[in-house]
């Protein structure tokens, strides 16, 4: 009888845990869905696994639901991450190189796209827990380079900051400021490599 009671208690706790994870994921998606368009400047802080600040940067973030995402880092080195909903582009103007990946294959290592995604197949690649206005996402696949992805978004759907923590403990924190909700053209989320840019098209692999 005692073993049966313990087993029942364990199953109950497991069920409650799964329910809490589902509720956190639903709450996060609901909050993100409240804002269809967002533009903001960001300040980036890179911190080593030992807690040392190793780099500061800045740039601009633009998102448009569903599935459109653009993040341009201006300093210390210009880079662009652009999603048109199907392809995710990583562009480095300094070395004139761009990598193209299918969004569905990139979510595991690039959780930024979740900020605008309604696709359950994307969200199922992460577990979600909630700590007030901060949501902690952890990849379900061990092959991910990301240890966790934190999103701070308030009850009105305003995105305040987000961060990635890599397996070696390095953290990239992006704090948003000068947030606006002005209309954005879909053309901002299109990318066409210029002549001379080397393209690593991983969609063909």
UniProtKB/Swiss-Prot annotation:
Name of the gene: lolA
Protein known as: Outer-membrane lipoprotein carrier protein
Q: By its UniProt entry, which CDD domains does this protein fall under?
A: LolA (cd16325)
* Key words of the record: Chaperone, Periplasm, Protein transport, Signal, Transport
Question: What processes in GO biological process is this protein linked to?
Answer: lipoprotein localization to outer membrane; lipoprotein transport
- Species whose genome carries this gene: Haemophilus influenzae (strain PittEE)
Q: What is the lineage of its organism?
A: Bacteria, Pseudomonadati, Pseudomonadota, Gammaproteobacteria, Pasteurellales
Asked whether the keyword Protein transport is assigned, the reply is yes
Oligomer and partners: Monomer.
Instruction: State what this protein does.
Output: Participates in the translocation of lipoproteins from the inner membrane to the outer membrane. Only forms a complex with a lipoprotein if the residue after the N-terminal Cys is not an aspartate (The Asp acts as a targeting signal to indicate that the lipoprotein should stay in the inner membrane).
Note one Pfam family from the annotation. LolA
Q: Which InterPro entries match?
A: LolA/LolB/LppX, OM_lipoprot_carrier_LolA-like, OM_lipoprot_carrier_LolA_Pbac
Keyword set includes Translocase: no
- Cellular compartments annotated: Periplasm
GO CC terms on record?
outer membrane-bounded periplasmic space
- Superkingdom per UniProt: Bacteria
The signal sequence is: 1-22
Similarity comment: Belongs to the LolA family.
